[in-house]
C-alpha cells in the first residue's frame, strides 16, 4: 500500500517534483541605502504587487500579470445523460475508444482494447459501484485523484487555472458519457476566434484593455530608468577603478602560524568540550521554536574565513516549520560530513600535503576512539543528491530531515555502492583556498561600490520579475468516493506533468499516457501506471518490468521489491536494539508501524552506550547518543512522506521481517548449529540473538554454558558456587511440557562425612547430627513470629510485606519484654504511654466521595451523603531495628547480583524481597468503624439527638461517656426509631486488627476479651531502601534503575529524567508505548459546592505521576439526556480544559479552577457549570490525553439538577388572588385576569399555587374543579396541562408545608492560563507546567429549603 502512494513522473526524462505553485508570488525587495531611496521609490510600481496563495486568488491586483481561477465541474449532467443508474454502473466498457482524435485516436483505441477485459471482469458486487474514467489534459499541469468523498456523494472535478487573463479565457473543458459506458473529461486550449464566437463580450474587457496599455507604458518607463541607472553604475565603477588601482597591489602573505591555524576548517563536535557544545547548541536554539531537538552544525574555527552556507535556502525554509513542529530529536545534515558532488571529486583528485594527511588521520583516529569510549557524538546525515535512474517513475527526492532518518543516494550510484563510501570527510585549507584566488591583486572595488552594485542588481531583478509573464497551467483534481474508479481507467497528461495519487488510498489498475502537445501521439508510461506495485529500484520503461541494482535480488513474493543479496562479512546478532517502531505523534495512531530499510557500510562502526554493543551505522542514518528528547522512539515517520518516498526506500511491517532479509544466522541442519548443551538452534535472526536460544520458560546460566529454570534451582556458574557451602551439582532433566528439550537442574551437595543442612546449602558433620528420642529438643520458648515483619522485606509500591527474609533471626541476647517471650536480636520494643492507649477518635463528617461519582441520586432537600470514622487503638508498641544481621539467603543473592545483571533478574529479586525494609513501625490492636449517613440532614439530626439524650439535665450539662458509635449501634440494635425514620438509612461497618485487650472498654466485646493479646502491624513509620545494603556502587546503581523501572515504568522500560523509555516489547496494538500507562481520572461532584437548580461544580484529581506519563489535557463532555438509558446518539458538547477553559475561549457559562489537596503535590482541577436547566438530567464525561495522544478510560457523572426556584410567599398571594377571582360571580374580565395570571407563572409556581389553594380553600372546591367551572374546560386544560412538566421528585418537594428561599455565597478559584498555546502544535505541552493565575471569587447559588416547619 505504501508503494501505491508515491507520486511518479509519467514520461521518460520527466522529473517534476512536488506540487507546482500556481500564481505569481513576487516578494518585497531588500531595503536600499538612504542615498538610493528616491530612485528606488521611482522604480517601484504604484500599487504593491502581492500575489499570495489565498482562496480568493482570482481577485488579484490589477498590475499583476498572473491570475488564478478555480472552477468546480460537477459530473451530474453527464451522469444524467447516461442510461444507467448511480449504483448500477456498467463496468465492461473500454477506457478510451472513440475519445481520441487525430493522431491520438489510435492510442485511444489501444487503451480501449487493453482496458475492456480487465474492467469487464470486476469481482462481484464491488464492481457495481465502480466507474470507468477517461481524463485527458492537453495543457501543462498535473492530474490529481483524491478519494475524499462519501459513497453517497457525487464525484466532481476541480480545475485550478494559473496564467494571464487572456490565456485563462482560452481554456476549454467538456465532459460526456461515451457509448461504451466511459465518463470522458477533456481539458484543451481554444483559439481566439472560437472563443469570440462562443463567448459574448463582457463589461470587463474595456477595463482590461486600458490596463494593458498602462502596463506597456509602465514597462517603457522602467526600461529607461534601468538604462540610466546602469550607465551611472558603469561610470562609478570606472572612477573607482582608476583611483584605487595603483594604491594596493602587493600580494598578501601569511605566516606559518596562520597557515597552521587554517589547516583544518571543521572539527567534529565530539572533539569539542561539553561547554563548547552546549554554548553553541544554545545559540542555535534561539532561532528555533522546537523545545525537543536542536540542529547542531560543526563549528568553524577560522576567524578571517568567510563561511558560506551551502544549503538550499528554499528547501530549508519549506521544512523548518515541519521540523520544529514534530520536535525532531535528530540533527540536520552537516555540510562537512560526506557531501557528494563535484567538490568531493575535485578534492579526491588533488592530494593534500603530507602534514595535512597526518593531521586528518590523527583526527579520524581520535574521532573513532571517542566513539569506542562512549563519548556523546553526533553523526550528521548525508545530503541527498539527485541520482540518475533508468526508471521513468522516479523523481528527485525532497531533502527532509524527519526523525533523524535520511535516505540519501549519491549521484550515479546504487544503494549497494554507497556502502563503500567514506562517511567522514574533513576539508582542509588547501582545498578551501581554491575559492579565494590566492596571489591575485586585490579588487579595486571597495564596499561602497559593491553596495551600489548589489542594490542595483536587486532592483533590476525585482523589476524584471514584475514583468515576467505567467505560463498557463491547469491542475485537474478529481474528487471521488472510495473504491469508485474501476480498473482500466485511462489518464492522459502533457509532457512535463504527472499523475498525482498521493492521497489515493485504494488505487485501481490504470493506463497512463503522456503527449508532447495536442496533436502528438500518446506514449504509454508503463512504469508510471504501476500504482499498486511500484518498482522499488529500477523499472524498464519499454516493458514496465522491475529490476534491482547490483547486490540486490527481487523479493521472492513481491517481485517489485528488492532485498539485499550480498552482505559481506555480516555475522552474529543484529545489534540495533535502539531502533523502535514509528508512530504518528499527531493522531496517536500506528501510522505507520514500520521499520525503514537502510543500507549499511561495514567499514565503520561505533559503540552505542544505550545498547552496550558495537553497531554498524547505516549510510543514511544519524545515530546521536546525545539525543535526550522526551520521546519513546528514535524513528518517527509521517505516513504521507513514507508513501511519497516508496521509490527510494521501502519498509517492513515488523522488525523480524527486516532481520529475516539478512538470511539465516546459523545452519541448524547439522550438529545443532554449533549450540552447546540444551540450547536450541534457531536459524531466523532476532534482536540480540546469536541463534542459540533457551527453551521456553528457561534462562541462560551466568557463564552461558546452558539453560536452567531460575525459579526452581540455583546457578552454579554465578561465581559464588550457587551459594553452596561445599558442592554444586548439575543434572540434565527433560522438560515435562516439551520432551525434545531439557533443563539443567542445579542443587547443593556435601562431601563424605557431611550431610546437607535443612537450609539446603550448608553442610553438617554426621557426628554432630542427633536423631531419635534421646536427643534434646530445641528451646521452644523462642517466638519467631512476633514482630517478624521487621525482619522481612517490604514493597513500598504495593504496601505489602514480602515473604523473603532480609535479616537473620537469632536469639543469642536476652531480649525480653513484659508479657512476651524472648524476642529476636536487633528488635527494640517500646510500649507507648497509658494516655495514648485506648483512645477513641471520631472524625468530622465529610461527604462520601465514593457516592459523588457515577450515577448519583442527589436530593437537594437532604444534602450530600456523609461518612464518619471511629477509631480505637490500644496495646500499642513502638518497634525499631537496633542492629541488623543479613540472612544467609539474602547474602547469597546479593553476591549473585552485579552491575551487569539484567533488569529481569533485579525485578525478580524485588518481587521476592521487596524494595525496602521496615526500620520503624507501630504495633498493637485497632478497631475502625465507618458510619455511612444517607444525607447531611440525617447526620445533623442524629448528632443533635445524641447530644440531647446523653446530656444530664442541669446547668453543667456534661456529656456522658457513651460514644457516638455506641449510641448509633444501640439505635440500630433496639430499633428505637423516631417519628421521621432517621436511623433507617444509617450503616456501620467495622474492621478489627488484632484483639482488643480486656482493659479497654471502648473496643471490648462480650466473650472475646483477652488479657494480653498479640500486637499486629498497624502503621509503618519509616522504611529504608534495600539498595543501601549493597556495597558495590555499580550494582547499587543498577538496582536503583530496576527499582525506578518497577515503580514508574511497569518494569518494561528505563527511567530517563522524569519520563519512561519503553522497551521494544512494551507497545500496544496501536503502536504507542504503554510501559507507563495513563491512569483513569475520577470525575466527581465537588464536595464543597452542592449542586443547585442551575449550577453544578465538578472536580477531579490530576492523574499525572511524578515520573512517566505526562498529561497534556483533559476533555470534558456534557449533555442533557432524557433517561439514564441514553442511546448516545446526541454527543453533546466537548470542551478542552487547556484550550477552551483555561485559555478563556469557552463560554461564560463554564469556568475552570484549580486547587491543591491535603498533599501540596496533588493538584485538583475543577469546572463549574452555571447555565444548566432546573430539574434536568445531565451526563458529564471526562478523559485524559497525554503528550503522545493516548486517551484514558472514561469517567462519568450522571446527575439531575435541583428543582426550580419558587417564591412561596408569591405563590400564596396568587392563590388568594385566584380564590377572590373565582368567588361569587366571575365576569369575563375576571376570567381573563385569572387565566393570564396562571399562564404567566412557571410550572413549579403553578404547582405551588395549586397546593396553597387546596390547603386553604379546598372546602369551597378543588383547584382543578373550580378552574374548569370558572374558566371553561379548554382554558382549564391549557393551564392544568403545564403541571405535567413537573417531575415526580419535584412534585413531592413542592408539597412540603414550607419552602424558603436562600442564597449561598461560596468561594471559588477561577483560573486562567498566562500563556497561549500555538495552534497546530504536534508536540503536546504538559498541562501541569502551564502557568496558571487563579483568583478567588464568590459564587452566589440560590436554593430552596424544604421543611414541615418554618425555619428560623
UniProtKB/Swiss-Prot annotation:
Keywords of this entry: Calcium, Cytoplasm, Cytoplasmic vesicle, Disulfide bond, EGF-like domain, Endosome, Glycoprotein, Membrane, Metal-binding, Protein transport, Repeat, Signal, Transmembrane, Transmembrane helix, Transport
Disulfide bonds: 527-539, 535-546, 548-562, 668-681, 675-692, 694-707, 716-728, 724-748, 750-763, 838-1000, 929-990, 996-1003, 1049-1060, 1062-1075, 1149-1171, 1203-1290, 1311-1334
GO molecular function: calcium ion binding; inositol 1,3,4,5 tetrakisphosphate binding
Tissue-specificity statement: Detected in cerebellum granule neurons; not detected in astroglia (at protein level). Detected primarily in cerebellum, and at lower levels in brain cortex, olfactory bulb, hindbrain and hippocampus dentate gyrus. Between 6 and 10 days after birth, when granule cell migration occurs in the cerebellum, detected in granule cell precursors in the external germinal layer, the molecular layer, the internal granule layer and in Purkinje neurons. Detected in postmitotic neurons in adult cerebellum.
Region (Disordered): 1-31, 308-327, 375-421
Notes on the domains: The C-terminal region after the fibronectin type-III domain presents structural similarity to annexin domains and binds calcium ions.
Binding partners and assembly: Interacts with ASTN1; the interaction is not calcium-dependent.
Topology feature Cytoplasmic, residues: 240-447
Bias (Polar residues) ranges: 383-392
Family note: Belongs to the astrotactin family.
Compartment(s): Membrane; Perikaryon; Cytoplasm, Cell cortex; Early endosome
Functional summary from the UniProt entry: Mediates recycling of the neuronal cell adhesion molecule ASTN1 to the anterior pole of the cell membrane in migrating neurons. Promotes ASTN1 internalization and intracellular transport of endocytosed ASTN1. Selectively binds inositol-4,5-bisphosphate, inositol-3,4,5-trisphosphate and inositol-1,3,4,5-tetrakisphosphate, suggesting it is recruited to membranes that contain lipids with a phosphoinositide headgroup.
Signal peptide: 1-51
Protein's name in the database: Astrotactin-2
This protein's record includes keyword Zinc-finger: no
Membrane topology: Multi-pass membrane protein
Gene Ontology CC annotations of this record: cell cortex; cell pole; clathrin-coated vesicle; early endosome; endosome; late endosome; membrane; perikaryon
Glycosylation (residues): 180, 796, 1033
Broad class of the protein's primary localization: membrane
Presence of the UniProt keyword Metal-binding in the record: yes
Residue intervals annotated with topology Lumenal: 52-218, 469-1352
Any single GO BP term: protein transport
Gene giving rise to this polypeptide: Astn2
One Pfam assignment: MACPF
Amino acid at each position: 500500500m505504501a508503494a501505491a502512494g508515491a507520486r511518479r513522473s509519467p514520461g521518460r526524462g520527466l522529473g517534476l517534483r512536488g506540487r507546482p505553485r500556481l500564481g505569481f508570488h513576487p516578494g518585497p525587495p531588500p531595503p536600499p541605502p538612504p542615498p538610493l531611496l528616491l530612485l528606488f521609490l521611482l522604480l517601484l510600481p504604484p500599487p504593491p504587487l502581492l500575489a499570495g496563495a489565498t482562496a480568493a486568488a482570482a481577485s488579484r491586483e490589477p498590475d499583476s500579470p498572473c491570475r488564478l481561477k478555480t472552477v468546480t465541474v460537477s459530473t451530474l449532467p453527464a451522469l444524467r445523460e447516461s442510461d444507467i443508474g448511480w449504483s448500477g454502473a456498467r463496468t465492461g466498457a473500454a477506457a478510451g475508444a472513440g475519445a481520441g482524435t487525430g493522431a491520438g485516436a489510435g492510442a485511444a483505441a489501444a487503451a480501449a482494447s487493453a482496458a475492456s477485459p480487465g474492467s469487464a471482469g470486476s469481482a462481484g458486487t464491488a464492481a457495481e459501484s465502480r466507474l470507468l474514467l477517461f481524463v485527458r489534459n492537453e495543457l501543462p499541469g498535473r492530474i490529481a485523484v483524491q478519494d475524499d468523498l462519501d459513497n453517497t456523494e457525487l464525484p466532481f472535478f476541480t480545475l485550478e487555472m494559473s496564467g494571464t487573463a487572456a490565456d485563462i479565457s482560452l481554456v476549454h473543458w467538456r465532459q460526456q458519457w461515451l457509448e461504451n459506458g466511459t465518463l470522458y473529461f477533456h481539458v484543451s486550449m481554444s483559439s481566439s476566434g472560437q472563443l469570440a464566437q462562443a463567448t459574448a463580450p463582457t463589461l470587463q474587457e474595456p477595463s482590461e484593455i486600458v490596463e494593458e496599455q498602462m502596463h506597456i507604458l509602465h514597462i517603457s518607463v522602467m526600461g529607461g530608468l534601468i538604462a540610466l541607472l546602469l550607465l551611472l553604475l558603469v561610470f562609478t565603477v570606472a572612477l573607482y577603478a582608476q583611483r584605487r588601482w595603483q594604491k594596493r597591489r602587493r600580494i598578501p602573505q601569511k605566516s606559518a602560524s596562520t597557515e597552521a591555524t587554517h589547516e583544518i576548517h571543521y572539527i567534529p563536535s565530539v572533539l569539542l568540550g561539553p561547554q563548547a557544545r552546549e554554548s553553541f547548541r544554545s545559540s542555535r536554539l534561539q532561532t528555533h521554536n522546537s523545545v525537543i531537538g536542536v540542529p547542531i552544525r560543526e563549528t568553524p574555527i577560522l576567524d578571517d574565513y568567510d563561511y558560506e552556507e551551502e544549503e538550499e535556502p528554499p528547501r530549508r525554509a519549506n521544512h523548518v516549520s515541519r521540523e520544529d513542529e514534530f520536535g525532531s530529536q535528530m540533527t540536520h545534515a552537516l555540510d562537512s560530513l560526506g557531501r557528494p558532488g563535484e567538490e568531493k571529486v575535485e578534492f579526491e583528485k588533488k592530494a593534500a600535503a603530507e602534514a595535512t594527511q597526518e593531521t586528518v588521520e590523527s583526527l579520524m583516529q581520535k574521532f573513532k576512539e571517542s566513539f569506542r569510549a562512549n563519548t556523546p557524538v553526533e553523526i550528521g546525515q548525508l545530503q541527498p543528491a539527485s541520482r540518475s535512474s533508468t526508471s521513468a517513475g522516479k523523481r528527485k527526492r525532497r531533502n527532509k530531515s524527519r526523525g533523524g532518518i535520511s535516505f540519501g543516494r549519491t549521484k550515479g550510484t546504487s544503494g549497494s555502492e554507497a556502502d563503500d563510501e567514506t562517511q567522514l570527510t574533513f576539508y582542509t585549507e588547501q582545498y578551501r583556498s581554491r575559492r579565494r584566488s590566492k596571489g591575485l591583486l586585490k579588487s579595486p572595488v571597495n564596499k561602497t561600490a559593491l553596495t551600489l552594485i548589489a542594490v542595483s542588481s536587486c532592483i533590476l531583478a525585482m523589476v524584471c520579475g514584475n514583468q515576467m509573464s505567467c505560463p498557463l497551467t491547469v491542475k485537474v483534481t478529481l474528487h471521488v468516493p472510495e473504491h469508485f474508479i474501476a480498473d482500466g481507467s485511462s489518464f492522459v497528461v502533457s509532457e512535463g506533468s504527472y499523475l498525482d495519487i498521493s492521497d489515493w488510498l485504494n488505487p485501481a489498475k490504470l493506463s497512463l499516457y503522456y503527449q508532447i502537445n495536442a496533436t502528438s501521439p500518446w506514449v504509454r508510461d508503463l512504469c508510471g501506471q504501476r500504482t499498486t506495485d511500484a518498482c522499488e529500484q529500477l523499472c524498464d520503461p519499454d516493458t514496465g518490468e522491475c529490476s534491482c541494482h547490483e547486490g540486490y535480488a527481487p523479493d521472492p513474493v513481491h517481485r517489485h521489491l528488492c532485498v539485499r543479496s550480498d552482505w559481506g562479512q555480516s555475522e552474529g546478532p543484529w545489534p540495533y536494539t535502539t531502533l523502535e517502531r514509528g508512530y504518528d505523534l499527531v493522531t496517536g495512531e500506528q501510522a505507520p508501524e514500520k521499520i525503514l530499510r537502510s543500507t549499511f557500510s561495514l567499514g565503520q562502526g561505533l559503540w552505542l552506550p544505550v545498547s552496550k554493543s558495537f553497531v554498524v551505522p547505516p549510510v543514511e542514518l544519524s545515530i546521536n547518543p546525545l539525543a535526550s528528547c522526551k520521546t519513546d522512539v528514535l524513528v518517527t515517520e509521517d505516513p504521507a512522506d513514507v508513501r511519497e518516498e516508496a521509490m527510494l526506500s521501502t519498509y517492513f511491517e515488523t522488525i523480524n521481517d527486516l532481520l529475516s532479509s539478512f538470511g539465516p544466522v546459523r545452519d541448524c541442519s547439522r550438529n545443532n548449529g554449533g549450540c552447546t548443551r540444551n540450547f536450541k538452534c534457531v536459524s531466523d535472526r532476532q534482536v540480540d540473538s546469536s541463534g542459540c536460544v533457551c527453551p521456553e520458560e528457561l534462562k541462560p546460566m551466568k557463564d552461558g554454558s546452558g539453560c536452567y529454570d531460575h525459579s526452581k534451582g540455583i546457578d552454579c556458574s554465578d561465581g559464588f558456587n550457587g551459594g553452596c557451602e561445599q558442592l554444586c551439582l548439575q543434572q540434565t532433566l527433560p522438560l515435562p511440557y516439551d520432551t525434545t528439550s531439557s533443563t539443567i537442574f542445579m542443587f547443593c551437595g556435601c562431601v563424605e562425612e557431611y550431610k546437607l543442612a535443612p537450609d539446603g546449602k550448608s553442610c553438617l558433620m554426621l557426628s554432630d547430627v542427633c536423631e531419635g528420642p534421646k536427643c534434646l529438643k530445641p528451646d521452644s520458648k523462642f517466638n519467631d513470629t512476633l514482630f517478624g515483619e521487621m525482619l522481612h522485606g517490604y514493597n513500598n509500591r504495593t504496601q505489602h510485606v514480602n515473604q523473603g527474609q532480609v535479616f537473620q533471626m537469632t536469639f543469642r541476647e536476652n531480649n525480653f519484654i513484659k508479657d512476651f517471650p524472648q524476642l529476636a536480636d536487633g528488635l527494640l520494643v517500646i510500649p507507648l504511654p497509658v494516655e495514648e492507649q485506648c483512645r477513641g477518635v471520631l472524625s468530622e463528617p465529610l461527604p462520601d466521595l465514593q457516592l459523588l461519582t457515577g450515577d448519583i441520586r442527589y436530593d437537594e432537600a437532604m444534602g450530600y451523603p456523609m461518612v464518619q470514622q471511629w477509631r480505637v487503638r490500644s496495646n500499642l508498641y513502638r518497634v525499631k531495628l537496633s542492629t541488623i544481621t543479613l540472612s544467609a539467603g539474602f547474602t547469597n543473592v546479593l553476591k549473585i547480583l552485579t552491575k551487569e545483571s539484567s533488569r529481569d533478574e533485579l525485578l525478580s529479586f524485588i518481587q521476592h524481597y521487596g524494595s525496602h525494609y521496615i526500620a520503624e513501625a507501630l504495633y498493637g490492636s485497632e478497631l475502625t468503624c465507618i458510619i455511612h449517613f444517607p444525607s447531611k440532614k440525617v447526620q445533623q439530626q442524629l448528632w443533635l439527638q445524641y447530644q440531647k439524650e446523653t446530656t444530664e439535665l442541669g446547668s453543667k450539662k456534661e456529656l456522658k461517656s457513651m460514644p457516638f458509635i455506641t449510641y448509633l449501634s444501640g439505635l440500630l440494635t433496639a430499633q428505637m426509631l423516631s417519628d421521621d425514620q432517621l436511623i433507617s438509612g444509617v450503616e456501620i461497618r467495622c474492621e478489627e486488627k488484632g484483639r482488643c485487650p480486656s482493659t479497654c472498654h471502648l473496643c471490648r466485646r462480650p466473650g472475646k476479651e483477652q488479657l494480653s493479646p498479640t500486637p499486629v502491624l498497624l502503621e509503618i513509620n519509616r522504611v529504608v531502601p534495600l539498595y543501601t545494603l549493597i556495597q558495590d556502587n555499580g550494582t547499587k546503581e543498577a538496582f536503583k534503575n530496576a527499582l525506578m523501572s518497577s515503580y514508574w515504568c511497569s518494569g518494561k522500560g528505563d527511567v530517563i529524567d522524569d519520563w519512561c523509555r519503553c522497551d521494544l516489547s512494551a507497545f500496544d496494538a496501536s503502536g504507542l508505548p504503554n510501559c507507563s500507562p495513563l491512569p483513569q481520572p475520577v470525575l466527581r461532584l465537588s464536595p464543597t459546592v452542592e449542586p443547585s437548580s442551575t449550577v453544578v461544580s465538578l472536580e477531579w484529581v490530576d492523574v499525572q505521576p511524578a515520573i512517566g506519563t505526562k498529561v497534556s489535557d483533559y476533555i470534558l463532555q456534557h449533555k442533557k439526556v432524557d433517561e439514564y438509558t441514553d442511546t448516545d446518539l446526541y454527543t453533546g458538547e466537548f470542551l478542552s480544559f487547556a484550550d477552551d477553559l483555561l485559555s478563556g475561549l469557552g463560554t461564560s457559562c463554564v469556568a475552570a479552577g484549580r486547587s491543591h489537596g491535603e498533599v501540596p503535590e496533588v493538584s485538583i482541577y475543577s469546572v463549574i457549570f452555571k447555565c444548566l436547566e432546573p430539574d434536568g438530567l445531565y451526563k458529564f464525561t471526562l478523559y485524559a490525553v497525554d503528550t503522545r495522544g493516548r486517551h484514558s478510560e472514561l469517567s462519568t457523572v450522571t446527575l439531575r439538577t435541583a428543582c426550580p426556584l419558587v417564591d412561596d410567599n408569591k405563590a400564596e398571594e396568587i392563590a388568594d388572588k385566584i380564590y377572590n377571582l373565582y368567588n361569587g360571580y366571575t365576569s369575563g374580565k375576571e376570567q381573563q385576569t385569572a387565566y393570564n395570571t396562571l399562564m404567566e407563572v412557571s410550572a413549579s409556581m403553578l404547582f405551588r399555587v395549586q397546593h396553597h389553594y387546596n390547603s386553604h380553600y379546598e372546602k369551597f372546591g378543588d383547584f382543578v374543579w373550580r378552574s374548569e367551572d370558572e374558566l371553561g374546560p379548554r382554558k382549564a386544560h391549557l393551564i392544568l396541562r403545564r403541571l405535567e412538566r413537573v417531575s415526580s421528585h419535584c412534585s413531592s418537594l413542592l408539597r412540603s408545608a414550607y419552602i424558603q428561599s436562600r442564597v449561598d455565597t461560596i468561594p471559588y478559584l477561577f483560573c486562567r492560563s498566562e500563556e497561549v498555546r500555538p495552534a497546530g502544535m504536534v508536540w503536546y505541552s504538559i498541562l501541569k507546567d502551564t502557568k496558571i493565575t487563579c483568583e478567588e471569587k464568590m459564587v452566589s447559588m440560590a436554593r430552596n429549603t424544604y421543611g414541615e416547619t418554618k425555619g428560623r
